[in-house]
């Protein structure tokens, strides 16, 4: 609080959320080639402020103002089969964000990691989740490790 009785806060300092998942063995079932599916597994909820988070990896904005937030994800993928083209993609309110995705070729037993950063405008109750897709086959994808958050 300054000498005039005004408290100045930075909204950037108040917005954060993180979920993580390590050593996951639950496969995400891929029913259709190149169709994103929400990541399967149980996430641990970390520190949150102006967001809520749950053990499915869903981050929900609870702020009173509309703001743009940077989402960051580090995802390690494994799959059955060779040379499988896998994609991670952010979905807002259950709808794919077309540009918020990145792909990598992965072979069984040789897990691959990808990082994704994307700015998303958020209003109260908007939520973001991570989805995966296999554009090579319907082989299931296991997200063995995942860090997902906002800052």
Specify the residue positions occupied by each region the protein language model found:
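Surface-exposed loop/turn positions
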Residues: 65, 124-126
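Terminal (often C-terminal
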Residues: 2-82, 101-102, 117, 138-151
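Terminal beta-strand-rich extracellular "head" domains
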Residues: 70-123, 131-139
């Amino acid at each position: 609080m300054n000498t005039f009785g005004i408290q100045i806060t930075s909204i950037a300092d108040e917005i954060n959320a993180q979920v993580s998942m390590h050593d996951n063995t639950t496969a995400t079932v891929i029913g259709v080639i190149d169709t994103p599916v929400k990541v399967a597994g149980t996430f641990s909820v970390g520190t949150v402020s102006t967001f809520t988070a749950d053990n499915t990896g869903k981050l929900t904005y609870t702020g009173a103002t509309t703001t743009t937030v940077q989402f960051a994800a580090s995802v390690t993928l494994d799959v059955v089969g060779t040379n499988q083209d896998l994609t991670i993609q952010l979905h807002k309110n259950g709808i794919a964000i077309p540009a918020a995705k990145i792909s990598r070729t992965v072979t069984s037993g040789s897990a691959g990691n990808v990082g994704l950063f994307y700015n998303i405008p958020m209003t109260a109750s908007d939520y973001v989740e991570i989805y995966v897709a296999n554009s090579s086959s319907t082989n299931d994808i296991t997200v063995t490790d995942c860090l997902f958050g906002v800052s």
